């Protein structure tokens, strides 16, 4: 069970604006030692915004002379009506494929009408590139993302999901813009946990969340009987987008989204179909041919991998462990280099198999199938 340390106290900081466009926070908390300190914050350009709030490139200083950073500060409005796991996750889970939280603080400011706005501020490592922008870098220039890059980013996303799912946490809004990447090294990190949920018996589950293009069929049907496998569906949509250069399914409503999905997967299956193995085999064969048509440039094992991810029945979707062991990732197990975009020199792959003790426990019997053989 994750726990949030109550380090803020009862009085959030009032951001004191100084003359040279930085402000002073007298109660900022370091994640490394959980100690409070006083720091100056200077915000630069805005690098993200949405219904959640804003993200700005920022630097910090204890004396307004020597500055640390850059960092990314995500500022969200604090609401008693909205319970978020974001701080719990960022504060308690340290993982190479999850964005790192460095500091955090609460603040408040006065609105134009004289009211008060209370905010949470997450000071995170600064990684300016997203998987979404990387996809556009390739396809806007008339090229395609290399297969090895697709597999490299996919494996790291799965590794992040393995950790979250082993704690019964679903991310809830997995999409290319929520995957930070460092193209020169091939590193990928999942970010934005504002929609994350803990799926246990004591949680009242919501049904309207996750960006529509990446929303699992069970969510589109307003089912409350869902699992962490909704993230696996979203991952399948992300893989398809890396292959094709645009979202796989682009509906403008829940119903039209299901219609778009049906163009690839066929109509949503009736329960009676499961009782006919012959019919099921026929449908699977048709689906495989349709996948080959939609993704003509990928190989047999890659199509088979997608079939294990993009399936209506959540119980038939492979989980993170099973997918990490798939032949789809053999190129990452058998080779040690990749060629970054725009580079003529190969570089070492990031360390993909440096699993922690908790990851090894979560992998269980799959561990030996995932790590490269010593032969």
Swiss-Prot record:
User: In what residue span(s) does the Protein kinase domain sit?
Assistant: 41-329
Catalytic activity from the UniProt record: L-seryl-[protein] + ATP = O-phospho-L-seryl-[protein] + ADP + H(+); L-threonyl-[protein] + ATP = O-phospho-L-threonyl-[protein] + ADP + H(+)
List, alphabetically, the CDD domains matched.
STKc_GSK3
What are the catalytic residues?
173
Q: Which Pfam families match?
A: Pkinase
**Annotated binding of ATP, by residue:** 47-55, 74
Modified residues annotated as Phosphoserine in this record: 211
What EC number(s) does its UniProt record assign?
A: 2.7.11.1
GO MF entry, a single one: protein serine kinase activity
**Record's GO cellular component terms:** nucleus
Gene Ontology BP term (one):
proteolysis
Family named by the database record: Belongs to the protein kinase superfamily. Ser/Thr protein kinase family.
Task of the protein: Required for heat stress-instigated phosphorylation of BCY1 which is involved in cell wall integrity signaling. Regulates activity of MSN2, a transcription factor that binds to the stress-response element (STRE). Probably promotes formation of a complex between MSN2 and DNA. Regulates the stability of ROG1.
Can you name this protein?
Answer: Glycogen synthase kinase-3 homolog YGK3
Taxonomic lineage of the native organism: Eukaryota, Fungi, Dikarya, Ascomycota, Saccharomycotina
């Amino acid at each position: 069970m994750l726990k949030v340390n109550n380090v803020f106290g009862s009085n959030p900081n009032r951001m004191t604006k100084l003359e040279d466009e930085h402000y002073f926070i007298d109660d900022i908390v370091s994640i490394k030692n959980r100690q409070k300190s006083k720091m100056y914050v200077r915000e630069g350009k805005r690098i993200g915004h949405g219904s959640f709030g804003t993200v700005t490139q920022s630097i910090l200083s204890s004396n307004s002379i020597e500055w640390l950073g850059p960092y990314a500060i995500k500022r969200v409005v604090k609401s008693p009506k909205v319970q978020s796991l974001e701080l719990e996750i960022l504060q308690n889970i340290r993982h190479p494929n999850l964005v790192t939280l460095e500091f955090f603080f609460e603040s408040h400011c006065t609105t134009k009408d004289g009211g008060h706005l209370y905010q949470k501020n997450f000071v995170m490592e600064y990684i300016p590139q997203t998987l979404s922008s990387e996809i556009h870098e390739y396809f806007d220039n008339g090229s395609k993302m290399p297969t090895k890059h697709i597999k490299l980013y996919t494996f790291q996303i799965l590794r992040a999901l393995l950790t979250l799912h082993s704690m019964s946490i679903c991310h809830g809004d997995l999409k290319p813009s929520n995957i930070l990447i460092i193209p020169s090294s091939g590193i990928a990190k999942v970010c934005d946990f504002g929609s994350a949920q803990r799926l246990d018996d004591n949680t009242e589950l919501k049904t309207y969340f996750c960006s529509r293009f990446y929303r699992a069929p069970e969510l589109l049907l307003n089912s409350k009987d869902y699992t962490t496998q909704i993230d696996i569906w979203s991952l399948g949509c992300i893989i398809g987008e890396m292959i094709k250069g645009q979202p796989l399914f682009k509906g403008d409503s829940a119903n039209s989204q299901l219609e778009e999905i049906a163009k690839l997967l066929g109509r949503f299956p009736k329960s009676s179909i499961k009782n006919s193995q012959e019919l099921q085999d026929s449908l699977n064969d048709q689906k495989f041919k349709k996948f080959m048509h939609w993704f003509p440039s990928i190989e047999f094992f890659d199509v088979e991998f997608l079939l294990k991810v993009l399936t209506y029945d959540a119980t038939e979707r492979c989980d993170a462990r099973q997918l990490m062991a798939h032949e789809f990732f053999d190129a990452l197990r058998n080779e040690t280099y990749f060629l970054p975009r725009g580079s003529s020199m190969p570089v070492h792959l990031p360390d993909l198999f440096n699993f922690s003790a908790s990851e090894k426990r979560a992998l269980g019997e799959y561990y030996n199938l995932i790590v490269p053989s010593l032969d």
